[in-house]
Regions:
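Active-site-adjacent helical/loop segments in soluble small-molecule enzymes
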Residues: 1-43
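Phosphate-binding loop/pocket of nucleotide- and phosphate-handling active sites
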Residues: 30-101
């Protein structure tokens, strides 16, 4: 079992690796973290979590988490989206600024 906060934090942690998980997969990831932390899955073992839903169906939830707009959750792993125009140069400039290039 996983709380709303545990699933949101687990999904946010996965977001930082380039994934875009749904809350259902967030539950599975949160439980995986719990099993690893409790030693039921050791550091030498491998585990696979199969995501069967698409995070795009839950964009409002994910944006709410990362923008800190979910009153019942503190967004401890928020990664606030940056909105840019649909323009290559604007995107490139922002990437350069964020990466120090």
């Amino acid at each position: 079992q996983a709380t709303e906060r545990e699933l949101a934090d687990a999904a946010a942690k996965a977001d930082r690796t380039g994934m875009y998980n749904c809350p259902h997969t967030g539950v599975a990831l949160a439980v995986l973290i719990k099993l690893r932390n409790s030693g039921q899955i050791s550091g030498s073992e491998r585990a696979v979590v199969i995501s069967t839903a698409n995070g795009l169906k839950f964009t409002d939830f994910k944006l709410g988490y990362h923008r800190g707009l979910l009153p019942e959750l503190s967004s401890t792993l928020s990664n606030v989206p940056i909105e840019l125009s649909n323009d290559y140069d604007a995107v490139r400039k922002q990437v350069d600024e964020l990466t120090g290039l």
